[in-house]
Amino acid sequence: MIRRICLDHFRRVENKCIELSRFSLLYGPPNAGKTTFMEGAALLIQSRGEQWLAFEGPLLIIHEPEDVHFGGDLERPFAVELSVEVEGELITYGYRYATASNYVEQWVGKDGKLLARMAKRGERGALLYPVEADLCVAPYAVMNEDALITCGAVEDERLRVAERALLTLRVGLKDKFYLLSGRRLAAWKYTYETHVDLMPATSVGPEGQFTAHHLSRILTQAAYERTRELLYAYLPLAGVEDVRVGLVKSGRIAMYVKSGGLWTNAYNAGNYTKAVLPVLLQLLLANPGSAVFVDDADLAVPATHAERLLGAFLEIARARGLQLVLAAKEPAFATAAERLGLEVVSL
């Protein structure tokens, strides 16, 4: 479970941390930083185990470094820090980077105590804590023990503990984080063609782009019988009576929904259905114990539907042992969240 996210000069957040519980709502006006916190966490998590920050990955795509540097200043480093509860331990991991100089700095801690800090020094790297030592390479590797390889032997148990903490965090976050962005309406403008071997096993994609593909599996495969039952139980919440998936002439998968007794292509469905259905499906598919982050949870949702919708999301999350973190700007969502027992984080 993700307990804390800290950002320093990342996108529009100058320096701020937020504390999260199992069920949280990030609430604030437009441009308050709700998306920034979610995407900061996503950037680190999609980069886990990589040799560099993965600006383009399965959770989000960042085309230019200027997009994440505060004020577009490539000289000033940005930093993202996560505190994650894994196997009964609270592991903190931070990554600082400046595009102009390629400066990098990392740190890892456990249960509130710093275990190791390393940074780029010259063309190589240096271990700054718990002792000073030269690193064989600059510590660019993300959430990876490779960033702690020293050129000589270092006899300090804290370094071994730091290596184990990085391994625990990297493995513990595998297939345990899902992000649904506010761009999920765009995916419904066209059908997707993808090889099933390349499709995420349990993710509908950050833009809901694999919604139809997963529905095809759920509706046709016996292994998804329980998921199918739950889907139909919650389907009216998305404003539709039934759903079908089929192939169009190009060989691509297309989705059809039934509403008011009539069938139509999902492209013709209202924005409410387009916004809500991928979220419901993601909650039903997510691996137990995962964190599901939903940006713009109030997207195309009338204020009168807020409590009913949040209540259903919460019900599924509780039943499946998920962490649920939502973001919304509508006051009705904050009011409903408080009534339902979600922690409201005001930005």
Where are the language model's segments positioned?
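Switch/communication elements of ASCE P-loop NTPase nucleotide-binding domains
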Residues: M1-G71, E85, D242-L347
